[in-house]
């Protein structure tokens, strides 16, 4: 059974891989090697993103074990996918005796393009939203489609009823992140001929995405938390990415 969520993820992945192979050709690299690397990394990242999501949503899944294998309705964590995917790419580069940093520089614009497109899957899956808003571009979601713990008091106080169905009106965090990824994509495409060292584009990607995601996570209400705390795991990872890689980018640029 196909879902719009799955279709958008697939479209983003295909366009991203297409761009990576074109960039590989432009750099005089073996396109087939990059295609192999991306396919392997994609498969590993899908599994990793699911495992990451389940691990940090264990309170729900331990009572609904069958839901762990329900891959049709979302339940994927991007950072889990990136972590597992980059690890797979690093292993692939080591086996093929090629530079991971060079490969990552070539791949990251395609990854960002895929992220920008794939985030729209969250719209159709009613995920990645923030607090109540009455802005014209507010995301409207049926209350029945949202877990009760993700519906705040402000959302309940401002329900919108259409044809007898109650909707919450919330910030479309997925949209903001999609636009941020598109902006970073354009930045990296503009810089790819001006980079000073291997790994520069990749580190800009990590620092830039971490910066944007850090702010978006503050407003997101359906975030994943570190067990036993009210601290979002993506918030922590985003802060680490920015704090580690942005100084390196600045210092090596100077």
PLM features per residue range, with description:
Residues 1-254:
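A feature for loop-to-transmembrane-helix boundaries and adjacent hydrophobic helices
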């Amino acid at each position: 059974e196909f879902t719009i969520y799955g279709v958008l993820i697939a479209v983003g992945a295909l366009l991203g891989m297409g761009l990576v192979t074109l960039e590989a050709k432009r750099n005089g690299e073996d396109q087939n090697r990059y295609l192999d690397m991306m396919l392997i990394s994609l498969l590993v990242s899908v599994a990793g993103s699911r495992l990451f999501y389940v691990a940090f949503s264990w309170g729900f899944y331990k009572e609904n074990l069958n839901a762990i294998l329900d891959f049709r309705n979302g339940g994927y964590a991007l950072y889990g996918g990136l972590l597992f995917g980059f690890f797979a790419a690093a292993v692939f580069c080591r086996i093929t005796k090629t530079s991971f940093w060079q490969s990552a520089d070539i791949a990251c614009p395609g990854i960002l393009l895929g992220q920008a497109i794939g985030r729209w899957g969250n719209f159709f899956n009613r995920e990645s939203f923030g607090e109540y808003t009455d802005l014209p571009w507010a995301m409207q979601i049926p209350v029945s489609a949202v877990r009760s713990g993700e519906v705040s008091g402000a959302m309940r106080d401002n329900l919108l009823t259409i044809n007898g169905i109650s909707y919450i009106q919330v910030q479309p965090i997925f949209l903001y992140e999609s636009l941020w990824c598109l902006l970073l994509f354009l930045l990296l495409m503009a810089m790819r001929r001006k980079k000073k060292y291997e790994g520069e584009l990749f580190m800009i990607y990590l620092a830039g995405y971490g910066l944007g995601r850090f702010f978006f996570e503050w407003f997101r209400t359906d975030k994943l938390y570190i067990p036993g705390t009210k601290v979002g795991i993506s918030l922590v990872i985003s802060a680490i990415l920015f704090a580690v890689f942005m100084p390196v980018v600045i210092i090596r640029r100077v």
